[in-house]
């Protein structure tokens, strides 16, 4: 499933690349290319962790139909569109949230999907904050990985295949 998910993402990125080129040629915005190799390496590590967190979260949500088959598409839509897009920093930077809410959101796995890797790439998160962010995202990676295996094993026990 992971390779299927990755191939879908690569296809989406290829289409987005052409859209990006067209918009760039029309608007000519300034582009920022990170020069610091350590920041680039930290960014790549944060991207790999983000990909795995995203996969684990969607795998867990996609397992909901084991217990409630009628919720297959709805639960997936709710999590991907509402929760992930909203809380990951894809729609707006998490910095604009009030301090208390921002701290709560930063303790969840969602910001480590988009907001954190982007801030690392821009060089806004370095040093101790970078290590803290990578540690928190790694902890979420382990928690979600264990949860995924648990949900999958429990789901297979209750699975009932019916049909012709």
Functional labels for PLM-detected ranges:
Residues 1-9:
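Helix-loop-helix units of permease transmembrane domains in multi-pass membrane transporters
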Residues 8, 12, 70, 97, ...:
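Membrane-interface junctions
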Residues 9-75, 130-139, 143-146:
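Alpha-helical transmembrane segments and their short interhelical loops
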Residues 25-30, 100-104, 127-129, 156-159:
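Short alpha-helical linear motifs
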Residues 30, 61-120:
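Transmembrane helix segments
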Residues 48-63, 83-95, 146-155:
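Transmembrane alpha-helical segments that form the membrane-embedded catalytic/substrate-channel core
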Residues 121-124, 132-164:
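Junction motif at the cytosolic side of a transmembrane helix
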């Amino acid at each position: 499933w992971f390779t299927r998910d990755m191939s879908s993402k690569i296809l989406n990125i290829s289409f987005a690349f052409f859209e990006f080129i067209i918009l760039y040629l029309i608007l000519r915005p300034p582009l920022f290319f990170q020069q610091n190799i350590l920041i680039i390496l930290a960014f790549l590590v944060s991207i790999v962790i983000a990909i795995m967190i995203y996969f684990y979260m969607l795998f867990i949500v996609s397992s909901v139909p084991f217990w409630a088959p009628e919720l297959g598409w709805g639960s997936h839509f709710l999590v991907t569109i509402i929760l992930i897009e909203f809380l990951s920093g894809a729609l707006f930077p998490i910095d604009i949230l009030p301090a208390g809410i921002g701290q709560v959101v930063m303790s969840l796995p969602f910001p480590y999907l988009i907001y954190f890797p982007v801030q690392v790439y821009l060089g806004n998160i370095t040093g101790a904050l970078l290590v803290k962010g990578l540690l928190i995202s790694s902890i979420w990676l382990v928690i979600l990985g264990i949860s995924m295996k648990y949900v999958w094993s429990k789901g297979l026990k209750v699975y009932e295949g019916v049909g012709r």
